[in-house]
Every structure is written in structure tokens, then in C-alpha cells.
Regions:
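C-terminal regulatory/effector modules of DNA-binding transcriptional regulators
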Residues: 84-185
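Interdomain hinge/linker segments and adjacent boundary elements that couple functional modules
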Residues: 1-80, 148, 158, 162-185
Length: 185
């Protein structure tokens, strides 16, 4: 099991910020496949391995006693047609299906927020169930890495809170996701 899967398996709470894509734990298989196909020089086998790994990670949200999962997503993510209009319509419909406040919430940071601290990149912060320090997962174009370095984790929590203060409430975010989904036809 990878380090990120181990941390997510022990998590009581997961907070994530995503400025470019739907968060990995909420991606459909088709959406994830499009994301991984976008990497230059990647083979079909590497794409399928990455998709399988991503789908296995998602099991954490459907286990008995899943973590509280709160995602903040930049509005531009909804409007970026990954894989085309039909795939985005299907993906946003699936996203609306899985929302389950208060256990699984998505809030949208509107474009009107302008340049935010979130433009520095995607991240996830996991608070573990009575078994150690908080951990962060930082994803780059090449790889993801997990850290429990207190200074890094605390800085990401502050960034998440700042972004959260700019995000629409859950109901308004759901309405926006639905509106954008309909715009895809």
C-alpha cells in the first residue's frame, strides 16, 4: 500500500484543495483516464495502472466510518472540459450524486475571488484517528509526496482555511455545479 493510501486509511478528516482538476478521490474512472493520458510520453499501461491506483484510493470514502471529507475546488475546474462536454456532464452529475453533507462536501471557490493562495498548488491535509500527527499530501505534475513535517502541514492548514473563507456555502456550490453541468448540454 502506498504512503498516501496508508494515511488516508487512518484519516478521521481529509481536507483538500484543488485549483486545476476534480480532486482524485472524487474523479470518475473516465475523468481520471483523461487526466493521466495528458502526460507526455505515458504508455497505455501506465495510464491504466494510474487509473486503477486512483480508483483504489477512493475506497476510503465508502468504507464503514469513512473520514469527513471536505473539498475546496476552484470554479475554473468545473468549466475546464476535461475529456469533452459529455464526459464533463456525466462527471459533474456523478459528483452531485456522491455529495453527502456533512460527511462529504464540496465547496467552490469562485472565479471572482481572483488570485488566491490556492494558486500555489493542490494539496490534501489528513487528520489521523488518534494515531499521530496530521499529514499532508502534495501533488505536482510529476509525483505526489506525503509529509508530516509540522511547519509544512500547518502552513497548508492556514492556506485551506483562507480558501475556505472565500468559498461558496455548500448549497450555493451544489447549485453552481448543477448549473455548469447543464451548460455542458
Amino acid at each position: 500500500m502506498s504512503q498516501v493510501r496508508r494515511v488516508e486509511a487512518l484519516a478521521h478528516t481529509i481536507r483538500t484543495w484543488e485549483p486545476m482538476l476534480i480532486p482524485g478521490l472524487l474523479q470518475t474512472e473516465s475523468y481520471a483516464r483523461q487526466v493521466f493520458r495528458g502526460r507526455p510520453g505515458v504508455t497505455a499501461e501506465e495510464v491504466e495502472n494510474a487509473v486503477r491506483f486512483r480508483m483504489h484510493r477512493q475506497a476510503v470514502l465508502s468504507r464503514p466510518r469513512p473520514p469527513m471529507y471536505s473539498a475546496l475546488i476552484d470554479e475554473s475546474v468545473l468549466r475546464r472540459p476535461v475529456g469533452g462536454r459529455e464526459l464533463m456532464r456525466e462527471h459533474l452529475a456523478k459528483l452531485l450524486e456522491v455529495l453527502n453533507p456533512p460527511y462529504l462536501t464540496v465547496r467552490i471557490v469562485p472565479l471572482s475571488a481572483g488570485l488566491t493562495t490556492g494558486c500555489l498548488g493542490a494539496f490534501e491535509v489528513a487528520t489521523l484517528r488518534d494515531c499521530g500527527p496530521d499529514h499532508a499530501y502534495l501533488e505536482s505534475a510529476e509525483e505526489g509526496r506525503v509529509t508530516n513535517r509540522a511547519q509544512t502541514v500547518q502552513a497548508l492548514i492556514v492556506r485551506w482555511e483562507a480558501l475556505s473563507s472565500m468559498a461558496y456555502p455548500v448549497d450555493k456550490s451544489r447549485d453552481l455545479i448543477h448549473e455548469v453541468m447543464k451548460s455542458y448540454g
